Amino acid sequence: MEGESVVAGNGHNKVANGVNYEAAVLERYGDAAQEVEACLCLPVSYDKTLLEVIPDEIIEKDYGCGDPSKYIHKGETVLDLGSGSGKACYIISQIVGAQGKVIGVDFNPPMLELARKYQKAIGAKLGYYNVEFRRGKIQDLKTNLDLVDGYLKEHPVQSVADLAKLDEYQTKIRHTLPLIADASIDVIVSNCVLNLVRPEDKKALFAEMYRVLKRGGRVAISDIVSDEVVPEHLAKDPNLWSACVSGAFQEEEFLKAFEDAKFHGITIEELRSEAYQTVEGIEFRAVTVSPGTFTSALISVSATPSPRYAFA
């Protein structure tokens, strides 16, 4: 999932609201890649036949709140934002088949290591290799951080001049070797990750999704939403943030974020009645919404015009 240090454009991990959100997320999901954290996010059921080729280690260390893979078709090119252990990518690889392609993007080295660990073995079982994992931030799908890491190993930053050269290199690869090219993706999926992005980066996140989608492309997102805007004192809690709670969008703001990024035809495919967490003693029940309620939502949207919102 999300986390860590080098940021395109300035080379430093940023602090917002007095909280280093990226460091909190990196640490939590880095640990969760090593040892299962059972209560992180909401477990869901998947098609068991699609899990047969996937090692238990990947399945056990998957942290999501929905199943966007249900909205994928054969032959499509799919981008998974915050691909984590790679479980969704390996499920989707079987749906799109040998003619399709799946790209997982994540910022967390331990998660990427886990996802890549079984690539060859799973491909051998399927008889084709159509999955790859790339390191980057989901709010900046132009900067390939594996390339940045490689550059830094050969050209460590030891002066202001070196830093300027790093910035120049990052600008160059963003244009000549983007992590994800413009209009190259049929479908974007993401599972309980958008909420982990820092507040000031969320607008860029939605703009990047729109940029990389082909015209007529689709988005299927499972994430956490709240019925009211999360209060500042909760947003400043790194444990709640990294647990997919205090970074949640308010429900209407979540939908509006897609609209503001020029998406159309927003369909609420599923809105869970059960709550993910109880915060500060607030009770959660059925479809009742109360201050601080956090629920799971699956949203599908299109990059072409159609009616505003719809429930499936």
Predicted regions and their residues:
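N-terminal auxiliary segments of SAM/dcSAM-dependent transferases
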Residues: E2-V44
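Conserved alpha-helix/loop element of class I SAM-dependent methyltransferases that forms part
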Residues: C41-T77, L81, K87-I95
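Conserved SAM/SAH-binding beta-strand->alpha-helix loop
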Residues: N108
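Conserved SAM-binding loop
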Residues: A115-R116
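A short acidic, Gly/Pro-enriched loop at the edge of an enzyme's catalytic core
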Residues: N144-K153, V157-I188
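A short glycine-rich, Lys/Arg-flanked "PGG" loop and its adjoining helix->strand segment in the class I
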Residues: K203-R218
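Short, glycine-/aromatic-enriched active-site segment of Class I SAM-dependent methyltransferases
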Residues: I224-V245
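C-terminal lobe and adjacent flexible extensions of AdoMet/dcAdoMet transferase-like proteins
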Residues: A261-A312
